C-alpha cells in the first residue's frame, strides 16, 4: 500500500531536518572548534612573545652585563646559571630556527611577529564569527522547516 502524500511530505521534512542537524553538528561545529583552537594557539604564541618583550625591556632598563637566573631543564627541574653577556639573545624564529640578535633587533622582531600574530588572530576571529552566523542561519532554517515560532530573546537586566 502506498503512503499518502501528506505522510511522505512529513517524512521528507523529517529527513531534511536530520540532514541539516547532521550538517550543523558534523561540519559547522567541528569547523568552529578547529578555528577556535587555532586562535587559542595563536594567542599562546602572542603571549610568549609579549613576555619576551617584557624581559628584554627589563634587561635594557637594568643595564647589567651579567645575569644570574634559573633555567628549566624540563619537568620543573631548574638549575642555577650565569649569563656572562646580556647584550645579545637567541630568539626562536619558528620552524625550529633560532637567531642571535641584539636586544634592539629582538624588540623589532617581536613587534613584527606580534603584529602578524594579532592580524592572524583577528582573521580567525572573523572566521569564527562567520561560522557562528552560518550555524545561526541553519538553525533559523530548521525552525522554519519545523514550523516553530521564534521565542522572544531574554531582555538584558
Curated annotation (Swiss-Prot):
Keywords: Activator, Chaperone, Cytoplasm, Cytoskeleton, Nucleus, Repressor, Transcription, Transcription regulation
GO cellular component: centrosome; chromatin; cytoplasm; cytoskeleton; mediator complex; nucleus; RPAP3/R2TP/prefoldin-like complex; spindle pole
Main location group: cytoplasm
Role noted for this protein: Involved in gene transcription regulation. Acts in concert with the corepressor URI1 to regulate androgen receptor AR-mediated transcription. Together with URI1, associates with chromatin to the NKX3-1 promoter region. Negatively regulates the transcriptional activity of the estrogen receptor ESR1 by inducing its translocation into the cytoplasm. May act as nuclear chaperone that facilitates the formation of the NF-kappa-B enhanceosome and thus positively regulates NF-kappa-B transcription activity.
InterPro entries: Prefoldin (IPR009053), Prefoldin_subunit_alpha (IPR004127), UXT (IPR003994)
Protein's name in the database: Protein UXT
Location of the protein in the cell: Cytoplasm; Nucleus; Cytoplasm, Cytoskeleton, Microtubule organizing center, Centrosome; Cytoplasm, Cytoskeleton, Spindle pole
CDD domains linked to this entry: Prefoldin_UXT
Record text on subunit structure and interactions: Homohexamer. Component of the PAQosome complex which is responsible for the biogenesis of several protein complexes and which consists of R2TP complex members RUVBL1, RUVBL2, RPAP3 and PIH1D1, URI complex members PFDN2, PFDN6, PDRG1, UXT and URI1 as well as ASDURF, POLR2E and DNAAF10/WDR92. Interacts with LRPPRC. Interacts with androgen receptor AR (via N-terminus). Interacts with estrogen receptor ESR1; the interaction relocalizes ESR1 to the cytoplasm.
Species, as recorded: Rattus norvegicus (Rat)
Taxon lineage: Eukaryota, Metazoa, Chordata, Craniata, Vertebrata
Pfam families recorded: Prefoldin (PF02996)
GO biological process: centrosome cycle; microtubule cytoskeleton organization; negative regulation of transcription by RNA polymerase II
Gene3D superfamilies: 1.10.287.370
GO molecular function: beta-tubulin binding; chromatin binding; transcription corepressor activity
Family the UniProt entry places it in: Belongs to the UXT family.
Amino acid at each position: 500500500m502506498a503512503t499518502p502524500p501528506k505522510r511522505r511530505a512529513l517524512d521528507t521534512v523529517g529527513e531534511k531536518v536530520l540532514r541539516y542537524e547532521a550538517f550543523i553538528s558534523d561540519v559547522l561545529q567541528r569547523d568552529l572548534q578547529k578555528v577556535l583552537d587555532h586562535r587559542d594557539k595563536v594567542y599562546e604564541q602572542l603571549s610568549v612573545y609579549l613576555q619576551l618583550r617584557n624581559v628584554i625591556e627589563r634587561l635594557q632598563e637594568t643595564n647589567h652585563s651579567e645575569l644570574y637566573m634559573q633555567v628549566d631543564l624540563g619537568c620543573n627541574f631548574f638549575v642555577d646559571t650565569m649569563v656572562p653577556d646580556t647584550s645579545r639573545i637567541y630568539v626562536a624564529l619558528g620552524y625550529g630556527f633560532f637567531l642571535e640578535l641584539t636586544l634592539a633587533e629582538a624588540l623589532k622582531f617581536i613587534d613584527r611577529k606580534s603584529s602578524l600574530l594579532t592580524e592572524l588572530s583577528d582573521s580567525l576571529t572573523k572566521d569564527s564569527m562567520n561560522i557562528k552566523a552560518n550555524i545561526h542561519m541553519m538553525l533559523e532554517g530548521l525552525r522554519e522547516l519545523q514550523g516553530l515560532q521564534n521565542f522572544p530573546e531574554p531582555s538584558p537586566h
